[in-house]
């Protein structure tokens, strides 16, 4: 079932004048999202831990003639809330009103039974896939609320709705992502113009 009318396509200026931050923008789905947003007119802020890969995506966007993106090297295994707050302060100091935040960065971790999952792997997966989502959204919320109709988009997985053996911490993190999305959407629904999906 599709909610998009047959034949509909977004215009190349659909996101003109919008600023969208994409985590995990250095490859895969995050790269595709960043490229698509840029091709529809958005200024994209590319966030990831591998600056060389982010630069490659930056170059692709510039070569397409899209608005010049920004690069934000940030390792989401970092647990220090001050780092996320500093990023928000830097963006605020640059007068950025954030129209979109796409949480795409994710770590798969070990594909083994939960009883055999190492605590280090568990911690890394939950940190990147959920705690960093919380910390980054929390820090950036004032910038999102400064935009007239901002949106927070979280990437989930089928194993975040129905657990499967050997998907371990990844599945648990995606269940947490789904729950976080629902709670945040409910909290903001009556008090803010920020949408959460």
Tell me the role of every PLM-derived stretch.
Residues 26-27:
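Conserved glycine-rich cofactor-binding loop
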Residues 42-56:
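Conserved glycine-rich Rossmann-like NAD(P)H-binding loop of the short-chain dehydrogenase/reductase
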Residues 64-79:
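Rossmann-fold cofactor-recognition segment
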Residues 112-114, 121-126:
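Substrate-binding pocket helix/loop in short-chain dehydrogenase/reductase
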Residues 137, 173:
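Active-site helix of classical SDR
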Residues 142, 186-190:
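Alpha-helical segment proximal to the catalytic Tyr-Lys
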Residues 157:
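Residue(s) in the substrate-gating loop at a strand-loop-helix junction
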């Amino acid at each position: 079932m599709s909610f998009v009318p047959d034949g509909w396509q977004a215009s190349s200026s659909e996101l003109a004048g919008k600023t969208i931050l994409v985590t995990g923008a250095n490859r895969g789905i995050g790269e595709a999202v960043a490229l698509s947003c840029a091709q529809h007119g958005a200024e994209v802020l590319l966030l990831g831990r591998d600056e060389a890969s982010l630069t490659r995506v930056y170059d692709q966007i510039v070569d397409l003639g899209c608005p010049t993106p920004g690069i934000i090297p940030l390792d989401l295994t970092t647990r220090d809330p001050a780092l996320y707050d500093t990023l928000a302060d830097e963006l605020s100091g640059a007068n950025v009103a954030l129209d979109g935040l796409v949480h795409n960065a994710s770590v798969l971790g070990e594909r083994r039974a939960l009883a055999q999952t190492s605590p280090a792997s568990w911690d890394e997966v939950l940190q990147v896939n959920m705690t960093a989502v919380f910390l980054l959204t929390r820090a950036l919320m004032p910038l999102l609320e400064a935009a007239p109709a901002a949106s927070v988009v979280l990437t989930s997985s089928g194993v975040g709705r129905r657990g499967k053996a050997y998907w371990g911490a990844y599945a648990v993190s995606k269940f947490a992502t789904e729950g976080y999305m629902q709670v945040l959407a409910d909290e903001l629904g009556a008090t803010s113009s920020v949408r959460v999906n």
